[in-house]
Amino acid sequence: MDVRAIQRIPLQLSQNCIVASIQVDLNDDLLRLFREDLLSLLQSSEADGIILDFSGVEIIDGEDWDAVRGTMTMANLMGARSIVAGLRPGVVSSLVELEVDVEDIDAALNLDEALKLMAAFRVMSEENEEAESRDGEAAQGDGR
């Protein structure tokens, strides 16, 4: 039996976020299982955020990054915000040199900073919702 086929990326819930602790080199099978596990947990837990902790990853190629990026997009379509944390300098250099898509990626130096960033995003989101609610009520009061 291929050990890689049963290897999984551990997922845990913390502060209404799914934290994926990626501490192994990535491969296609592992990324497929990760996507399935993550999206399933996202649906069942109703978490509103995902933090991908890459602190254990020493190298990532363009195809693996695209797969991770695709998983982040899927999670976003399910209503969760994604933050990448713990990318090592060599990994960051490789991603930039490979010219992979890193636009609109929210990132943090480490897991603690990612949790703080997620909390800040929640506050901003709540403030925006409150402002929109007030604007809607004011518009109704004006007869609009």
Pin down the residues of each PLM region.
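Short, conserved, surface-exposed binding loops centered on an aromatic residue
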Residues: 10-13, 40-44
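STAS-typified acidic loop motif
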Residues: 7-35
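Extended, hydrophobic alpha-helical segments
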Residues: 6, 25, 34-42, 50-51, ...
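Solvent-exposed alpha-helical segments within well-ordered globular domains of core cellular machineries
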Residues: 32, 36, 40, 66-73, ...
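Intrinsically disordered or compositionally simple regulatory linkers and C-terminal tails
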Residues: 1-3, 120-144
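Amphipathic alpha-helical interaction surfaces in cytosolic regulatory modules
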Residues: 45-48, 52-101
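Domain-level recognition of nuclease-like catalytic cores that cleave nucleotide substrates
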Residues: 20, 106-107, 121
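Short acidic-hydrophobic, aromatic-tinged amphipathic segments that line or gate anion-handling sites
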Residues: 103-114
